[in-house]
Structure formats: C-alpha cells, structure tokens
Curated annotation (Swiss-Prot):
Keywords: Guanine-nucleotide releasing factor, Nucleus. Residues 301-434 form the N-terminal Ras-GEF domain. One of its GO terms (molecular function) is GTP-dependent protein binding. The lineage of its organism: Eukaryota, Metazoa, Chordata, Craniata, Vertebrata. Residues 43-118 form the DEP domain. This is Rap guanine nucleotide exchange factor 5. Its main location: nucleus. CDD domains: DEP_Epac, RasGEF, REM.
Length: 814
C-alpha cells in the first residue's frame, strides 16, 4: 500500500477498515443504536464531555477513552469486562459516530481523547430514540463486536512521518529543560544501541568493518563521522540523527594536541558547593549585552542560572547587576525571571527579609571595601524599584511588602547622609512611593532625623490608596438569570447596588425599571428580594444560589425563549448593527479585560490550580468572557425563529469573526468560530444550505486557523506575524505554560529548577509583547453607546440541553 493510500485510509471516518458502509457490515439498526448511546452520554454523563488539553492542542467537548469504558461497565451490568466495552466503543469509532482527535484507528482504553459527531438519525422511526431503550442498543452492538476486522491486517500508519510533525516535535522539545532532554537522549541512544546489537546478531555477514589504514580509508568500508570536542552528545536532535543512520560509538585515543586543546577548553558548566552540597549551578553562554571595554574574550561570555537555592540565586542576581543605564541582556532577563516567578519557591516575606539582609549586611562575601557598600545598597534598591514597577498595585495589598517598603525607605533616609550617592535612589524611591516633599542631604543627618516625614509617609501612602479597597474595586461578571438556563451577563463592581444592576438588566430587556425586581434564590429554594440600596453581589451567593429578575406583576420569571416580539426585536437589533463596529466594540471590551491581567496571574493559575482565586481575578474574567461569547453566538442564532433572518445572522457572525481576526482579537475570534461550530448550531442543515458559497468559503478559511493539528501550527504562525496590540487565544497560552510546568520538575536535587522557571517566564512575557502598543477605538460616540450597551451585557443560554431543544424546535429531525 502506498503512502497516499494509507493517508486516504486514515481520513475515512465512517469505516477506516473496509470499503463498505457501516450499515452494510453491521446492519441498518447499528447506527441508530450507536447514536442512542452517544445521546445518552451527552444527556446523562455531561461531566465526561468537556474541553480538554493535551500536549498537541486544545480540544472542544472531548471524552477520555478509559472514562467511557468505566461508564459503560457501571451502567450496563451485561457488559461483563473491559474488552467487551472496548468492542462497543470500537464499533462507534468504525461507524463515524465518534472519532479520535489523534486519528487513531483503534479505540484505546487509556487517556486518549475522543469526540462525538453531531449527525442525527435519518430514519423516521428509531426504536432506540427513547431514553429507556438505549441499553437495548448496547446489547445489539455487543452482538456485532465479533464483526470487527482483525487488527493484524490493518495498515500501520504510525511510521508515516511528515515534515510538519517533525517541526511540531521540535516545538515540544523546546519546552523541555536540558535535564529532561538529556534523559530522553539517553533513552533513545540506549534503544538505538540495543536495536543495532540485535541487527548485528541477525545479519553478521552484512556488517561493515571500519579499520584504520596507513594508506587512507577503504572506499568500501562505509563512512566514519567524527564528533568534535564541543559536539553535545546530549542534544536530542544529534541522537536522533545518529540513531536514524545506525551509527555506533567508537572510543579512540586522543592525539596529544587534542588533549592539550581539551585542557585549554573553558568550562561550560559551573557548580558552586557549600559543605559538599551543590547550592548553585551556572551555564556559560555568549553575552548579548553591551560591548566589553577590554578586548578579553572572558568579557564576551556570561553565566546564566540553571538551578540553585533561593538565597544563592538572589545573591548571584545582585552580584550580576551593575549600575549602568543598560544591563546585560542575560542579567536583565534573570532579574525579570526572578521577579515573575519567585512566588513559586519562596514567600514574599522571605524575599523581603533576604533583601533587608543584603541591604544592611556589614560584610558581603568577606571583608568589603567601603566603596562597595553603597554600590551593594544601590543594587538592592534597583531590584526593589524593578519589583515595584513590575507588580504595581499587587504589592499594595500585601502586608509584608508594605512593611518592608516602609522599613527600607527609613533605612535609606538614615544612610543617605553617610553615602550621599544614595540620594538619586532616594528621590526615585520617593517618586514611586508618592512622597513628594523635597529634601536636602543635611536633612538626612543623624542630628536631624525627620520623624515627622516618615509619619507623614505612613499616613498618606498615596501609592496604597489610589485603587481603593478590594471590595470596592474588584469587578466580576454578575449573571442575572431570566430563566433556569438563560442569563444576562453584567460586568459590575462588587460594591454595586441592586438598583445599579437592575438598571442594566431593564435596559437590556427593554422594560421599565420600576416593573422589575431582583430576587436571590438559593439552591435550597429560599428567596430574598433585593431592596434598591442592597449590595447584590456576594461571593457566598455565587456558591449557594443565583440572582433572578422578576416582573413585579407576575409570580414567574420572564420567558425570553417564547416566539414573541422580544426575540424578534433582539434579532433585528443585531442585524441592524455594523459588523466592523461591533467587532471593534468586542475588541474594546476584551482589551480592557486583557490589559488588566497581571503577568503574575498566569503563574498563580498554573501552579495553584485555582482559576478563580483572588490572584487570578482578571485572567478568570477573560476566560469566562471567551465562554460567554461562544454561548452568545449560539443563543442569538437559536432564538431566531425565521429561517431567512437566521441565515442573515449566521452570515453576520461569520463577518464579525473575520473582522475580529483583522483587528487581531484572537480570543473573540476563536469564541465566535467555536460558537458557530457548536453541535446545536452546526446541525441546522436547512440554515447552512442557504448560506452563500462565498460565506462558506470564508468560514472554511477562518476554521483553518483554529485547526488544533500540529500543536495549533496555523494559529501560531498567523499570530507571530501580527504586530501589537493583539489579544492571544488565552486558553492556548495557558496550555503552553501548563505543558512546561508538567513536563519539567520544579526542584532538582533540592535545588530550584530555574531553567524551567525561565521558560515559563518567557512564555508569560507574551502578554507584555502583545500590550506594547495600546488599542484605540474609532467608533463614533453615538453608535458606540448603543454597541457598548449591547456588547458589555450579553444575553446567553448556558445549558447545552436547552440549546439542543431550541435547535430541534427550529429544525426537527427528518
């Protein structure tokens, strides 16, 4: 079988083994039984169908193979063993009712992702359509398991490698530290060696002998490649090459000149030990900093941190800092890496105490000259100023950092009389901390210590107060439910009153505010009506209940799902909006969320595994927004009862997605495309048939950018070409950070694996690059107000079951 035949074979979903349809092989009812099993999984085991991430990409609504087997064994007593359950799922895979995201031909009972198709039964009457009949379908499938083709005769496609897949492997390897790469290289080399030995035993008469001859190499003796002294045998790509070419390693005696050269060769790795224990590991790299003043080659190379204890990493960082305007690139990167990731291996209090020790130390690495004391103090102050600049208002809420800054500010006041050179750092410190009073050197003398000055600083603390308290300023998405499964999303401060939220909801529903009321209903059924001045938002309420909007003259909630004038007006409203301006307003709203995310939030999100914690508020908002935009697209389309207007809506959303891509808002772009691909929308065959060909072609091009194959290569290539400002697809960025975290240990031999933290910080700095330039909207003020009101408060249905019911109501099964 040729490569083309194998590739064609791998793409066939309906039946990957035979040229006959599933109905011809398994019978007419087999597909109905398979779809019934799929539908019951979606309805009764929705927790198994979720968005998932693995090393290759992000997959929507996927299931895990082993979990599907467990579920079938639990709910079908007549399925007696795992092999029987595997056979049932293999039938669904053969029939195209489910597919492997990795395009595997066989169902695997392990952590492999599968996705269900959204096609419906084409028969007018299906005996397995009712929920209670699905187990009969499973019994039918069990009877057909013996018809599954034997695996031995199937073409193995595992060796069909492509250039793109090799590029994807290189990208994955780039996210592994050198320690992990060396371990992989050792395993591959060992495997290659065992394979070569076995081959030599089988083909002893075909081996090639390499001999050393005085008259030169034998032309029939094969090719001997020599590894130079500086070739790194730990490099994964070198081992790959040697294994492919079936090379064997031969040890030869070094010539005298080579031995001398080796002795003169400089060390590339340095270990610092204390009491026999390694405390710091450094690696030599070529310097990318300013040109050295002297011609020494030593100045052209620097050492970067591979691993170490927290104290030694900080000590090396301070030693490496210099007080010139331009730092070496390695030093600048080390400083930024340390400040971004220090919370992984030490607390803020530990860092504060360590910095105070370095600032106040009488001796530093032995006897210190008096001239080095102010230099060391200035380095500590430089690090602190960079820390404040990077974290900004994050430090305002930490008691340890506030006390530390007060203490070190007082120490600088005490020291500036003895070391006048610190006056520049003091003024910069005062500017950062908001102390604007001017001082002279005389004022800092021990005889004139100005206690009132520090008291003034303690009382004022402008830099601590400009945001207000967390309770007053924190913003969240408040969900005001209209029915059990539909809500209006309102971005509001935690301190918002019920009247403020009700005003937004009334405007969205186009009803009089005085006719509506907000009611909190707990999951136990208790009701509490909010008064106008009550605080409506509570984190405790999020976990225990919901906020509903009621009409005061009715005992029930509003019902926007009915085919009434309100739903028609909503469709007409969006159809009358300019798609470019609507995309701009989406960009403006998303940019406000994206611009508020602190780089540190990605670190907390990855290491704490808490996506909604206090330290990841802004990141959680943007992720939630992505989900809401996807639901909004499906909601608007499925609430439109007229076929003609529904076709216009789909065209509208395709254009909005294209504009989001053009405006470099990849977060909303992905959300809209995924919303159009939602099963409840994609099944509307009558609607999609009426979409013009040029729109279908445009949508196909947009879909190609969301293709998860080869680790989202299409998206990554397009994103690299975009210039700031731009908004990345945040779930994918988080996946990259998570992959680095899970693929590399945080500690190696009780030392901080700083090489891993550097890779994480480098990925996190993507946010900084995207925000190099700021976004500005060009929408006219009058139009902007209407668009802003619409975009900021989206109306969505968050129940997949409710969306499917609407979908079947619009276009029932044939």
């Amino acid at each position: 079988m040729t490569t083309g035949d194998c590739q064609t074979l791998s793409r066939r979903i309906s039946n990957p083994y035979l040229e006959h349809s599933p109905s011809q092989i398994y019978g007419e009812n087999s597909s109905c039984a398979g779809r019934a099993l799929r539908n019951i999984i979606i309805l009764q085991a929705a927790d198994l169908v979720k968005d998932r991430v693995n090393l290759k990409g992000f997959y929507r609504r996927s299931c895990v193979g082993s979990e599907l087997v467990d579920w079938l064994l639990e709910h079908c007593p007549f399925v007696q063993c795992r092999s029987m359950a595997i056979g049932v799922w293999q039938l669904l895979l053969d029939m195209g009712i489910m597919s492997s995201v990795d395009q595997h031909l066989y169902f695997q009972d392990n952590y492999v992702f599968y996705q269900f198709s959204s096609d419906e039964c084409s028969y007018l009457y299906c005996e397995f359509e009712r929920e209670e009949e699905w187990q009969k379908g499973v019994k039918l499938l069990l009877e057909l398991v013996h018809l599954i083709p034997a695996r031995a005769g199937i073409c193995d496609l595992s060796h069909q490698k492509t250039e793109d897949s090799e590029e994807s492997s290189d990208e994955i390897l780039a996210r592994l530290t050198s320690a992990v790469q060396r371990e992989l290289a050792a395993v591959i080399a060992l495997k290659a060696r065992k394979s070569a030995i076995e081959q030599d035993d089988e083909n002893a008469d075909k081996h090639v002998t390499v001999t050393e001859a005085n008259n030169g190499p034998d032309p029939q003796a094969g090719v001997m490649c020599k590894l130079q002294e500086r070739d790194d045998i730990g490099r994964i790509e070198l081992v790959h090459k040697l294994a492919r070419e079936n090379c064997q390693f031969l040890q030869t005696e070094k010539k005298e000149s080579e031995k001398l050269e080796q002795q003169d060769d400089e060390v590339t790795m340095v270990q610092v030990k204390e009491q026999g224990q390694s405390v710091l590991v450094l690696k030599k790299v070529a310097s990318c900093g300013p040109a050295p003043t002297s011609g020494s080659a030593e100045n052209d190379a620097r050492y970067v941190v591979v691993s170490g204890t927290p104290e030694k990493i900080l000590e090396h960082l301070l030693n490496d800092l210099h007080l010139a305007e331009v730092q070496h690139k390695e030093t600048e990167t080390l400083l930024d890496d340390f400040l971004l990731t220090y919370t992984v291996f030490m607390t803020t209090d530990d860092l504060c105490q360590a910095l105070l020790r370095h600032y106040s130390a009488k001796k530093y690495q032995g006897e210190e000259e008096n001239s080095d004391v102010p230099c060391r103090k200035r380095k500590v102050l430089h690090l602190v100023s960079q820390w404040i600049s990077l974290y900004k208002d994050w430090l305002h809420e930490d008691e340890h950092s506030k006390m530390f800054l007060k203490t070190i500010y007082r120490n600088v006041l005490d020291d500036v009389y003895e070391y006048p050179i610190l006056e520049k750092e003091l003024k910069e410190f005062q500017k950062i901390l908001g102390v604007y009073r001017r001082h002279t050197v005389d004022e800092y003398s021990p005889q004139k210590k100005n206690k009132a000055l520090f008291h003034q600083f303690s009382l004022k603390e402008n830099w601590l107060q400009h945001r207000g308290t967390v309770a007053e300023t924190e913003e969240i998405f408040c969900h005001v439910y209209i029915t059990e499964h539909s809500y209006i999303s309102v971005k509001a401060k935690v301190s918002s009153t019920a009247q403020e939220i009700l005003k937004v909801v009334a405007e969205k529903l186009q009803r009089a505010e005085e006719d509506l009321a907000l009611v909190a209903i707990t999951f136990s059924g208790e009701k509490h009506e909010f008064q106008p001045n009550d605080l409506a938002i509570s984190k405790s309420l999020e976990a225990s209940g919901r906020i509903y909007v009621y009409r005061k003259d009715l005992a029930d909630t509003l019902n926007p799902l009915a085919e009434n004038e309100e739903s028609q007006q909503r469709s007409m409203r969006i159809l009358g909006m300019n798609t470019w301006d609507l995309a701009l307003e989406l960009m403006s709203f998303d940019w406000s969320l994206f611009n508020s995310i602190h780089e540190q939030e990605l670190i907390y999100f990855t290491f704490s595994r808490q996506g909604n914690g206090e330290n990841t508020v802004n990141l959680s908002l943007l992720l939630q927004r992505c989900n809401e935009v996807q639901l909004w697209v499906a909601t608007e389309i499925l609430l439109c009862s007229q076929l003609g207007k529904r076709v216009q809506l789909v065209k509208k959303f395709i254009k909005i997605a294209a504009h989001c891509k053009a405006q470099q808002n990849l977060n909303s772009f992905f959300a809209i495309v995924m919303g159009l691909n939602t099963a409840s929308v994609s099944r509307l065959s009558q609607t999609w048939e009426k979409i013009p060909g040029k729109f279908k072609k445009l949508f196909s091009e947009l879909e190609s950018l969301t293709d998860p194959s080869l680790n989202h290569k299409a998206y990554r290539d397009a994103f690299k070409k975009m210039k700031p400002p731009k908004i990345p697809f945040m779930p994918l960025l988080l996946k990259d950070v998570t992959f680095i975290h899970e693929g590399n240990k945080t500690f190696l031999d009780n030392l901080v694996n700083f090489e891993k933290l550097h890779m994480i910080a480098d990925t996190v700095r993507t946010l900084r690059h995207c925000r190099t330039n700021q976004f500005g909207s060009d929408v006219s003020p009058k139009e902007q107000q209407e668009l802003k009101s619409y975009v900021n408060h989206l109306y969505v249905i968050d129940s997949q079951q409710a969306l499917f019911e609407l979908s079947h109501r619009l276009e029932p099964r044939a």
